[in-house]
Every structure is written in C-alpha cells, then in structure tokens.
C-alpha cells in the first residue's frame, strides 16, 4: 500500500502470549490469525464515531436517535456486532430502515467492510445521509478495477460467492458486464465470442488454491481471458490459510474460531480439513461455548486459528477451555509477520 495507506495507530499484533511448553497434550496455535487490516479499520471506524458522540454528550440524544447507524454487519462476526450494538450502534439491513430524521440530523451511516453497490450509494446521497465508507481498501480496489475494465470495453468474469455482501457490491458496479461464477462447473454456462475482451476478477476472501481449478477451466475455454496486473486475493486470506495448512500437519484436529457467515472462516475450516485428511476433523465455532469435549477425546494436539473478523479474546476463550480439558502445552506456528495498516475513512480524517 502507499504511505498514505499506513496508520501507526492500527496494529495487527495477536495478543495471546505463547510460551512453548513441551507437554503431552498441547494446543498448536496458528500465526497469523484473527483481525486483518480491513477489519481493524472498519471496527475502529464505528468505535471512533461512538467515542466522538460520547465525548460530545450525544450518545443519548433527546430525539431518541442513535449516535451511528451501520448498514449490514460491519464485519462478519456476531460478537463484534453485538459489542458495538451494546455501545450504541444500530445495525440495519437496508437504508430504508433509517428514518429521514436521522439523515436530517446528520447521524453518520457507516458502510461495512464488504463494500456496497452504486445503487446503495445513490440512495444514501438522494436522502442526504452522512455516509462514512468503511469498505476495505482491498475490496475498493476490485470495485475500481470493474469500472476501469468496463470503460475499456471488457466483459468481466468474477469468481465469488453468490449473495455474499462483497460479491453483491462488486457485481452491482455493472451488472450487465460482470458475470459471477462460483465453481469450475459454472464455466460451462458462459458463452463469449472470440473477439470479446475478457478479464478475470475474484472475491478478495477466496484463496489462490480455491480459485485455481476455476481459473484453469476459464483459460481452457477462453484462452484470451486476461488477469489484472496484481492479484485480487487478500493478503490476510492467503496468510491465514498458509498457517492453517502447517498447523493441520502438526495436529490431530483443528478448531477454527469464526462465524458461519464469514467466508474466510468457513474456508479456513475446509483448508484445515484438507490438511488433516483422514487423520482428524476440523471444526468451526463462534466461541468456546460451542466446543464439545467429545471432539478431543484421545487426542494429543489441537490446532487453533481464527477468521479475519475474529477478536483474539474469543481465541483465548477457546484456549482456556482446551486447557481445562488437559491441553496445557502450547506451540505457535508462525508463517509470516503482518504489518499492513489502513488509515481511517476520509470522512473521519477530515474532521481532525
């Protein structure tokens, strides 16, 4: 990222203190794991607005309006959403749920890290809403690529999960020119003339491994299809999956902490299962309360990682639960140190 994209106030350091202890039963902890820079930025965006409202005495307003509205889950983790809601943020599915009085009062409306389509932005502008856009800069890059390629006359094949907030926003940039596919088998449904300018883009939370077969099928059917100069795959997606692969090799089972609607958390579980093979099973839990002690009977080592939207305290809770089950040893598997940071949205920086 450029120097302007760096903010020393945002850190991605994991907070769990790992001291390797050689014990019979142990936890194998993936590093990196948890919050990525885009998630950190999105959460801090809402927290900054809440703190400003608190400081100005506007957290509880006489008109009954909240200090901030957030369209959709700011990140795909229910604990993060519940925590921010407890501080006063109001989450809505659509802008129509926000009263006109809120727009007139200048109540901030935050767009989530996953991005939104031009239709949503146009509605917010029409209603005079004070928008703070917390779209992850890496997602924003894909939006800009769509617009550029459409201007240059391309048809765009976009690999993503149908219905995922990120995919909905990207496709919405130009629905008539962006063709969403999910799997290798979907390539058969595409039909382009040989003189069609084609380019391939993908959802940031997919991995290189996950898209490899689909990309190969696309290139086999449309040999002239182009790829952008740099990958759309998020660094955090690649890093977390690489760490989980190594953790799975050293574990009898793997627990991924993350919500069911988190694309990267679900994929981490799949990557872990692929790494385990027939030796063991991978599980996904929102928090320690969903652990089943029966999963760990007869095991010597349990691997742990978490999705990019997961606070480290939830991982700590899982570790504590496993320690109570006798997994008192601790080993960390580090594949890379992350130092990516994103500044707050421009709407908040202008206020400083």
Swiss-Prot record:
UniProt signal peptide: none
Cofactor note: Binds 1 [4Fe-4S] cluster per subunit.
First-tier enzyme category under EC: oxidoreductase
GO biological process entries: dimethylallyl diphosphate biosynthetic process; isopentenyl diphosphate biosynthetic process, methylerythritol 4-phosphate pathway; terpenoid biosynthetic process
Binding site residues for dimethylallyl diphosphate: 76, 114, 164, 262-264, 309
Molecular-function GO term, any one: metal ion binding
Cofactor: [4Fe-4S] cluster
Pfam families, sorted: LYTB
Sorted UniProt keywords: 4Fe-4S, Iron, Iron-sulfur, Isoprene biosynthesis, Metal-binding, Oxidoreductase
Enzyme Commission numbers on file: 1.17.7.4
Binding site for [4Fe-4S] cluster: 36, 136, 234
Reactions the enzyme catalyzes: isopentenyl diphosphate + 2 oxidized [2Fe-2S]-[ferredoxin] + H2O = (2E)-4-hydroxy-3-methylbut-2-enyl diphosphate + 2 reduced [2Fe-2S]-[ferredoxin] + 2 H(+); dimethylallyl diphosphate + 2 oxidized [2Fe-2S]-[ferredoxin] + H2O = (2E)-4-hydroxy-3-methylbut-2-enyl diphosphate + 2 reduced [2Fe-2S]-[ferredoxin] + 2 H(+)
Function: Catalyzes the conversion of 1-hydroxy-2-methyl-2-(E)-butenyl 4-diphosphate (HMBPP) into a mixture of isopentenyl diphosphate (IPP) and dimethylallyl diphosphate (DMAPP). Acts in the terminal step of the DOXP/MEP pathway for isoprenoid precursor biosynthesis.
UniProt similarity note: Belongs to the IspH family.
Protein name in UniProt: 4-hydroxy-3-methylbut-2-enyl diphosphate reductase
Originating organism: Bifidobacterium longum (strain NCC 2705)
């Amino acid at each position: 990222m450029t120097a302007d994209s760096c903010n020393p106030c945002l850190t991605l350091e994991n907070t769990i203190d790992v001291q390797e202890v050689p014990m019979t039963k142990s936890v194998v902890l993936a590093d990196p794991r948890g919050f990525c820079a885009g998630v950190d930025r999105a959460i801090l965006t809402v927290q900054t607005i809440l703190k400003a409202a608190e400081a100005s005495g506007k957290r509880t307003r006489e008109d009954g309006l909240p200090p901030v509205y957030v369209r959709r889950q700011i990140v795909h983790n229910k604990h993060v959403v519940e925590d921010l809601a407890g501080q006063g943020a109001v989450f809505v599915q659509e802008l129509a749920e926000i009263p006109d009085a809120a727009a007139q009062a200048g109540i901030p409306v935050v767009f989530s890290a996953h991005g939104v389509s031009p239709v949503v932005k146009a509605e917010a502008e029409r209603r005079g809403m004070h928008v703070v856009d917390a779209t992850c800069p890496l997602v924003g890059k894909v939006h800009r690529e769509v617009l550029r390629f459409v201007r240059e006359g391309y048809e765009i094949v976009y690999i993503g999960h149908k219905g995922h907030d990120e995919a909905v926003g990207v496709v919405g940039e130009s629905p008539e020119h962006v063709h969403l596919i999910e799997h290798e088998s979907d390539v058969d449904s595409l039909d382009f003339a040989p003189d069609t300018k084609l380019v391939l883009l993908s959802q940031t939370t997919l991995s290189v491994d996950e898209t490899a077969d689909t990309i190969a099928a696309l290139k086999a059917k449309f040999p002239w299809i182009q790829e952008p100069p740099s990958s759309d795959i998020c660094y955090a997606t690649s890093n977390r999956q690489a760490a989980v692969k190594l953790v799975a090799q050293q574990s009898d089972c793997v627990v991924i902490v993350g919500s069911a609607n988190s694309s990267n958390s679900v994929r981490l579980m799949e990557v872990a299962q692929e790494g385990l093979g027939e030796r063991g099973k991978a599980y996904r839990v929102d928090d320690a309360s969903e652990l089943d002690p029966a999963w760990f009977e007869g095991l010597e080592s349990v691997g742990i990682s978490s999705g990019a939207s997961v606070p480290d305290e939830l991982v700590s809770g899982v570790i504590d639960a496993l320690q109570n089950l006798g997994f008192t040893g601790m080993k960390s598997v580090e594949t890379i140190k992350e130092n990516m940071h994103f500044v707050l949205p421009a709407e908040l920086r202008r206020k400083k």
